[in-house]
């Protein structure tokens, strides 16, 4: 059975979806440093991270079973993309996953400013 490791509080639906597709899934709430990450990746083929976990060349070298890294955030700058690509590790992210939420916030801010709510807020 393929193993997946999801870090940094990735939504439980992601873990369940992976289980539904035959993965053995381990989840952890926080980010891991390089040494801890290498230890945790023993036998893992899929790593799911957010922006605080760095996937360096050293991590990639130490984890031959790793085949994919999912960045559950906007960017992929926390992963050594060139090195991952040279080692056949696919890296993906969800760049527009929060677009609707951002639009809703901006519209709400516009309405608040039009109604002068910040000017009428007392601390």
List the model feature ranges, each with a label.
Residues 26, 33, 45-123:
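Phosphate/diphosphate ligand-binding glycine-rich loop within oxidoreductases
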């Amino acid at each position: 059975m393929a193993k997946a490791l999801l870090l940094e509080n990735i939504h439980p639906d992601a873990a369940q979806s992976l289980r539904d597709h035959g993965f053995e899934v381990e989840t952890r709430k926080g980010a891991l440093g390089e040494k801890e990450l290498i230890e945790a990746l023993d036998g893992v083929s899929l790593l799911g991270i957010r922006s605080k976990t760095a996937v360096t060349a050293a991590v990639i070298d130490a984890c031959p079973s790793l085949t994919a890294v999912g960045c559950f955030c906007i960017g992929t700058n926390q992963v050594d993309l060139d090195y991952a690509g040279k080692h056949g590790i696919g890296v993906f992210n969800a760049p527009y996953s929060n677009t609707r939420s951002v639009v809703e916030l901006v519209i709400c801010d516009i309405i608040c400013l039009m109604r002068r709510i910040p000017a009428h807020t007392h601390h």
